[in-house]
Amino acid sequence: VCIFFENHLMRGNRTTKMNAENFNAFRSFNYPVLAEAGIHIKYNNVQIHVNGEERELKPHYLLDTNVVVLKLFPGIQENVIAAILGIDGLKAVVLETYGSGNAPRKEWFIRQLCQASERGIVIVNVTQCSAGMVEMERYETGYQLLQAGVVSGYDSTTESAVTKLMFLLGHGYTADEVRDRMNRSMAGEITL
């Protein structure tokens, strides 16, 4: 799936809407543009992956929407985290962290994440930044998240991480299987 907008062709699972008013509204920060249209169309053939076989488009309707996005912010309190992680039926959280995957070092925060992971809630770490990636082993706080059962979202967009989780959960994968598959590219959504 691609997005063609304002003369640019971009991978849908690598693209984020950045502006609600301008024509140049979509950006693909962590993956090159596939083509640019002007007088001539300039294709970025190296980045265009062709399967080699023609197949009929098969939409996937089995999505489990018991997924939330939790954006961290300075001063976030335990009751907020506990309320979100305690949502009835919650199966996965996309945790938007600072920079390359950093989060509060507070004991209660790590404890809440550990308890949620132990209950089978999949927690995926993505950066709040427009570009770049999560590197959980780079800093102590990221390493603590790993110890709490949080998995890296690498350079995934928030939108792509949510969709991937909904797809995997909707197809009946267990929490451990989902955690494992979040570390693999299914459709070019992350760079490994």
Where are these regions (language model features)?
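Core catalytic loop region at the nicotinamide-binding pocket of NAD(P)H-dependent oxidoreductases
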Residues: 1-3, 176
